[in-house]
């Protein structure tokens, strides 16, 4: 089970640094007078993060997380994730959002509830079947909420996405000595053909890596999903089962994936409960989506700095995904 915690105000302009946060601004956002706030800088892969220790005038203490994504590469997808896309979904697996604002060409900020005292991400926790069921059930609810509500992505959208991946092919081949160009061409053709058909599509999270999933420190559920994929080139609508494939194939140890993937896929399918979408089609889409996960290490390889700096990650991802492709 999971608990809805979504509320948000569109509070602009976009914060440029954590020190811009003031008691006056927080008072307006929280709807309660704030006496003082202390800011503790944090880290993020593509963002600036900070923990805010907030003291209200009545002495109540509250901990919040500020996230700043600044620059022209960021779209408004993550702001919509908190302020629009799942507001009407009971039980949406999102942490509470108090404020969010996006400006084109500038970026966005988010002010989120901080659950670090009671919850942790899944980076250092071995996945289990029960955890997989929790993720699958939460994703099914989100996918059902926007099931087949849009046309399939157009060719320009797919091209923009693939243009981010393709430069990584030659770099991957040079770094590893493995030829993948012809294999990728076959996959791209299958990908384009299937993604031209809107069956089985929904809004996507796009980046359910283990650091973007929170659970209680002593349990595998409920789950909360953070940090929707924020880039302008990201695919925000497409084959729904890709979210589940990406949450597992690049990250799960191979024996655990092999033993539990089909049961978790079936739990997602049963929880989705869409009679217009057959189990056979879901399995076909799963296989294509697991193969699509190879785009992740290729995208790492597409940029010179991450080709080297993130080799420890993308090589491990490639190995796991290859094993997942070969799993029954």
Labelled PLM ranges:
Residues 1-106, 216-223, 234, 328:
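Conserved NTP-binding catalytic cores of kinases and kinase-like/nucleotidyltransferase enzymes
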Residues 3-5, 144-194:
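Active-site catalytic-loop/activation-segment of kinase and kinase-like phosphoryl-transfer enzymes
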Residues 80, 237-274, 290-312:
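Active-site activation/catalytic loop segments of kinase-like enzymes and analogous catalytic loops
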Residues 99-134:
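Conserved structural core of kinase catalytic domains
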Residues 112-126, 144-147, 292-308:
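A glycine-centered beta->alpha junction motif in the catalytic cores
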Residues 121-155:
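Conserved kinase catalytic-core helix
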Residues 203-206, 210:
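Catalytic-loop of the protein kinase fold
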Residues 211-247:
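Catalytic activation segment of kinase domains across protein kinase-like and atypical kinase folds
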């Amino acid at each position: 089970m999971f608990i809805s915690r979504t509320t948000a105000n569109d509070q602009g302009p976009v914060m440029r640094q954590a020190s811009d946060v003031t008691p006056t601004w927080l008072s307006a956002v929280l709807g309660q007078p704030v006496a003082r706030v202390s800011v503790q800088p944090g880290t993020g892969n593509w963002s600036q993060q900070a923990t805010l220790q907030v003291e209200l005038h009545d002495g109540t203490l509250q901990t919040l997380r500020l996230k700043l994504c600044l620059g022209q590469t960021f779209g408004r997808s993550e702001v919509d994730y908190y302020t629009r896309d799942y507001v009407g979904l009971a039980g949406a697996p999102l942490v509470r959002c108090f404020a969010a604002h996006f400006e084109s060409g500038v970026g966005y900020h988010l002010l989120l509830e901080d659950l670090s005292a009671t919850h942790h991400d899944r980076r250092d926790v071995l996945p289990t079947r029960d955890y997989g069921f929790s993720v699958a059930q939460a994703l099914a609810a989100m996918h059902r909420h926007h099931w087949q509500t849009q046309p399939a992505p157009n060719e320009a959208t797919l091209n923009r996405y693939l243009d981010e991946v393709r430069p990584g092919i030659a770099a991957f081949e040079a770094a590893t000595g493995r030829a993948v160009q012809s294999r990728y061409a076959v996959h791209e053709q299958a990908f384009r053909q299937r993604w031209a058909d809107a069956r089985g599509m929904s809004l996507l999270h796009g980046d359910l890596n283990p650091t973007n999933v929170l659970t209680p420190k002593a349990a595998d559920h409920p789950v909360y999903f953070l940090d929707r994929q924020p880039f302008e080139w990201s695919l925000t609508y497409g084959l729904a089962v890709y979210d589940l494939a990406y949450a597992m194939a690049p990250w799960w140890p191979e024996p655990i994936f092999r033993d539990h993937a089909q049961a978790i896929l079936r739990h997602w399918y049963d929880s989705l409960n869409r009679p217009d979408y057959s189990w056979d089609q879901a399995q076909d889409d799963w296989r294509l989506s697991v193969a699509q996960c190879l785009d992740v290490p290729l995208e790492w390889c597409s940029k010179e700095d991450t080709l080297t700096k993130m080799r420890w990650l993308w090589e491990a991802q490639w190995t796991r995904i290859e094993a997942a492709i070969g799993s029954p």
